[in-house]
Amino acid sequence: MATGQIFSKTTQALFYNYKQLPIQRMLDFDFLCGRETPSVAGIINPGSDGFQKLFFGQEEIAIPVHPTIEAACNAHPTADVFINFASFRSAAASSMSALKQPTIRVVAIIAEGVPESDTKQLISYARANNKVIIGPATVGGIQAGAFKIGDTAGTIDNIIQCKLYRPGSVGFVSKSGGMSNEMYNTIARVTDGIYEGIAIGGDVFPGSTLSDHILRFNNIPQVKMMVVLGELGGKDEYSLVEALKQGKVQKPVVAWVSGTCARLFKSEVQFGHAGAKSGGELESAQAKNQALKDAGAVVPTSYEALETAIKETFEKLVEDGKISPVTEITPPPIPEDLKTAIKSGKVRAPTHIISTISDDRGEEPCYAGVPMSTIIEQGYGVGDVISLLWFKRSLPRYCTQFIEMCIMLCADHGPCVSGAHNSIVTARAGKDLVSSLVSGLLTIGPRFGGAIDDAARYFKDAYDRNLTPYEFVEGMKKKGIRVPGIGHRIKSRDNRDKRVQLLQKYAHTHFPSVKYMEYAVQVETYTLSKANNLVLNVDGAIGSLFLDLLSGSGMFSKQEIDEIVEIGYLNGLFVLARSIGLIGHTFDQKRLKQPLYRHPWEDVLYTK
């Protein structure tokens, strides 16, 4: 491995398995460091493509999303770092795929628990092809003022406190990602800060070792001293001991191996990492610390003394003129996210949508304040749900049963009506369910199913103004307006619409008042004197009876009733009901595998 610097201020990465927060932290670090280009060139989300919006300072940017590693590498040939946030189950396969890409030079594997046999294969391939693996089980790494991997160094506040927005003179490597954050802070307190920091990961077989990075730091001119934080278990530290003995490291090394307390336990102890377990004497923290000290590293007597050892080593280098003071800079402030600012009470922002009928912010959705569990446990019906979501109140059971009756009676009226016909033709053209449904719904209007609202409006206006049926009908005639809710293509005086009869019978039995329906029947009596088919149709029946429901229930003010009729609630009832039938016709045609519909010539009048 050896060589030298693996990151720079122009390094770009590909991020595998989209995670919003780690990517945003990388971009915030970029802005803090004054980078001109974002460090994340592209995102790989298997099976997906498009863009993800994130912030680069104050500016919102779109980062490309690619479905495969190969596609991402081809699209971003200058991105040579692969940050793998895959789970331990797929981390090995995706990492190997990345290593095989000619443009990828460094692979960071975040997942913990990658099978050791898979890790060995990755290590073997990387070494044979002169590539670098950081991890598995790592938080990543950072080059101060230039580039960082994922969540390395934590929050922006911590990064600023540790002075990671500009380079220092210390190269740092550890096994533990959590302890690396602590050490960045320690090093910043007693030196001019780190130049580069790496957490190799706590698994038994790390992709790169402590000595790999120390030897690399030794070749970086800007790194004047190194700090190593090892841990008990394994023999990784001994490769560093050999490098020190052989004179391969010419810069001061301050080292400490944690886990000296393991001797206090009578049996083998497993600490946080897979590789951090007490084994034989050679793997103990005491033995490693002694070996490092004998090889020439500066090893304190305890972890508490590590900070002093780092400080003294750094100050000696300054005295010897090997380190020049770093020019301190003031990093730019990172704009605070709106959500964070609102949560902390720093700003207030207007909302863009008002919703009064449902709320999904709690443990369960609520319809007009009624929890979903209550709706199910108390046996609410579809009519009850409509009363909550449409009328924002729980209507009496006779009202909700009437609503359900309207839905059942209007669900379908055969394949010959315009709505069903359109859905059938569309379905037979091979279109999808939604297209077929909408095709039928778009025929609903003044001539088909959409007269309920108008019937209610005109009947209400006439009744409230005390117009006689004669005055009402003749007045409409003078205006050139057909009376909505009156007339049928098939039904007549002698062939009444059964649906109308059922609705009227229910209302007479359950409604406290049917004044609007009785008025509509009086109008029907007058219109039947003119023509045999001018009967009260289902639109007129529902329209007039809904007026009786609203006024008779005592739960709506006059203003609310006028608003409900004006908005179009009653046509909404027909739209909801007829959707059931239109969906049924669509499924029926598809189930029967009916061919494309073509209207027969003999049913067309061709004329000039």
UniProtKB/Swiss-Prot annotation:
Q: Please give one Pfam family short name.
A: Citrate_synt
Q: What is its EC number?
A: 2.3.3.8
Catalytic activity annotated for this protein?
Answer: oxaloacetate + acetyl-CoA + ADP + phosphate = citrate + ATP + CoA
Q: Where does Mg(2+) bind?
A: 231
List ligand-binding residues for CoA. Answer: 292-302
Q: Name one GO biological process term.
A: fatty acid biosynthetic process
List positions binding ATP. Answer: 214-234, 265-291
Protein's UniProt keywords contain Thylakoid: no
Annotated GO molecular function terms are: ATP binding; ATP citrate synthase activity; lyase activity; metal ion binding
Name where it mostly resides: cytoplasm
Write down any Gene Ontology CC term.
Answer: cytosol
Q: Key word Cytoplasm present in the record?
A: yes
Q: Which CDD domains match?
A: CCL_ACL-C
Q: Which UniProt keywords apply?
A: Acyltransferase, ATP-binding, Cytoplasm, Lipid biosynthesis, Lipid metabolism, Lyase, Magnesium, Metal-binding, Nucleotide-binding, Transferase
In which compartments does the protein localize?
Cytoplasm, Cytosol
Question: Which residues participate directly in catalysis?
Answer: 273
Q: Which PANTHER family match?
A: ATP-CITRATE SYNTHASE
Quaternary structure and partners: Heterooctamer of 4 alpha and 4 beta chains.
Query: According to its UniProt entry, what is the function of this protein?
Result: ATP citrate-lyase is the primary enzyme responsible for the synthesis of cytosolic acetyl-CoA, used for the elongation of fatty acids and biosynthesis of isoprenoids, flavonoids and malonated derivatives. May supply substrate to the cytosolic acetyl-CoA carboxylase, which generates the malonyl-CoA used for the synthesis of a multitude of compounds, including very long chain fatty acids and flavonoids. In contrast to all known animal ACL enzymes having a homomeric structure, plant ACLs are composed of alpha and beta chains.
> Of which family is this protein a member?
Belongs to the succinate/malate CoA ligase alpha subunit family.
What name appears for this protein in its UniProt entry? ATP-citrate synthase beta chain protein 1
